[in-house]
């Protein structure tokens, strides 16, 4: 599946992916990709205030994960002359139009390590905001699965799914860990083998998920068939060529990932326009630098922007947003 590049604010089919007699016309006309690329470049130049990883943590990590400790040491070397680590990201780097962070970055590490290195200036702290259950709910919105949308508005989706008779014995984390592979198209036998559970048990879970997400399955399958028929798939800001050799599961999941990227771009533009100090984006999360004296107002303002961004893409439906971490520079405190 080939990405169709974006230039400024018009996304075209690219002639080098096309037959000589194919009529090429613009698929998408809007300024969002251009505005996002500009905002993203501005965010990257600001960077994130960090301190080096301490030696005891490096030694402990070295015993567990040598690849991770190499990343940590690379970051330490970059912080020798400057306590501000700039991010290097590439907009529209994937076929779904998502941005990819390249090279040493805070995004290279799991969140449990962030408190070891984040070091905001006095009077400031970093706040991580995150869209809740983004991919399942995007799928539900694409499929007009109103029952799932209603559950999401009122309660935690994964907790609510435990009410199903065949999922009642599972905790929230287990259900979350099953749902995403299911939505991505993983088969029950593959899941059973990967997690070392009986095939009959995995099949029972998959049947339960199919009962809950049958409208989603139908819609994603329909979009996938249409993409193979038309030879391309598109969202608000991006498009990709689909060929008979394209991976079916990737094509099926493309609208969900691409819609998430559409939302992120509008959220970034909205945060920058609102004067919120956004320092880093990671998939569907946003790291903000906020004055402690204005913490509540800034967070509330940012959450409003993120909800509005999702509504612009999901026909008025707002994704829930949570505070997923607060980092004030104290080591080990999230």
Q: What are the functions of these language-model segments?
A:
Residues 2-64, 185-213:
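Extended, well-ordered alpha-helical scaffold/bundle regions in very large, multi-domain proteins
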Residues 95-96, 299-334:
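C-terminal, non-catalytic extensions of nucleic-acid polymerases
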Residues 139-141, 194, 293:
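Hydrophobic alpha-helical membrane-insertion segments
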Residues 136-138, 289-291, 329-334:
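Short, solvent-exposed polar/charged micro-motifs at secondary-structure junctions
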Residues 162-281, 320-334:
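Conserved catalytic core of nucleic-acid polymerases
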Residues 23-169, 232-285, 299-308:
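Acidic, glycine-rich two-metal-ion catalytic cores of nucleic acid-processing enzymes
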Residues 190-191, 287-303:
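Catalytic palm subdomain of template-directed nucleic-acid polymerases
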Residues 146, 183-187, 290:
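Short alpha-helix boundary/capping elements
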């Amino acid at each position: 599946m080939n990405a169709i590049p974006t230039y400024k604010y018009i996304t075209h089919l690219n002639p080098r992916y096309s037959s000589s007699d194919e009529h090429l016309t613009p698929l998408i006309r809007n300024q969002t990709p251009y505005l996002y690329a500009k905002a993203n470049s501005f965010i990257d130049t600001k960077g994130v205030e960090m301190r080096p990883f301490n030696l005891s943590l490096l030694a402990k990590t070295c015993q567990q994960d040598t690849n991770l400790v190499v990343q940590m040491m690379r970051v330490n070397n970059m912080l020798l002359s400057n306590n501000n680590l700039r991010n290097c990201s590439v907009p529209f780097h994937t076929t779904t139009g998502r941005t990819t962070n390249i090279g040493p970055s805070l995004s290279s590490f799991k969140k449990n390590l962030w408190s070891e290195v984040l070091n905001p200036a006095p009077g400031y702290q970093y706040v991580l905001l995150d869209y809740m259950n983004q991919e399942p709910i995007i799928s539900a919105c694409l499929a007009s699965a109103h029952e799932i949308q209603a559950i999401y508005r009122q309660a935690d989706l994964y907790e609510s799914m435990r009410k199903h008779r065949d999922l009642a014995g599972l905790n929230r984390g287990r259900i979350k860990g099953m749902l995403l592979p299911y939505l991505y198209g993983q088969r029950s036998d593959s899941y059973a083998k990967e997690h070392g559970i009986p095939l009959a048990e995995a099949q029972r879970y998959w049947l339960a998920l199919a009962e809950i997400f049958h409208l989603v399955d139908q819609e994603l399958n329909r979009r996938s068939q249409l993409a193979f028929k038309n030879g391309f798939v598109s969202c608000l800001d991006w498009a990709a060529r689909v060929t008979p050799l394209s991976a079916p599961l990737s094509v099926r999941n493309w609208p969900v990932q691409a819609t998430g990227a559409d939302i992120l771009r509008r959220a970034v533009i909205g945060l920058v326009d609102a004067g919120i100090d956004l320092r880093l984006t990671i998939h569907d999360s946003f790291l903000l630098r906020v004055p402690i004296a204005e913490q509540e107002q800034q967070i509330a303002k940012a959450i409003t922007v993120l909800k509005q961004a999702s509504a612009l893409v999901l026909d008025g439906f707002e994704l829930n947003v949570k505070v997923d971490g607060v980092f004030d520079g104290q080591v080990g405190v999230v």
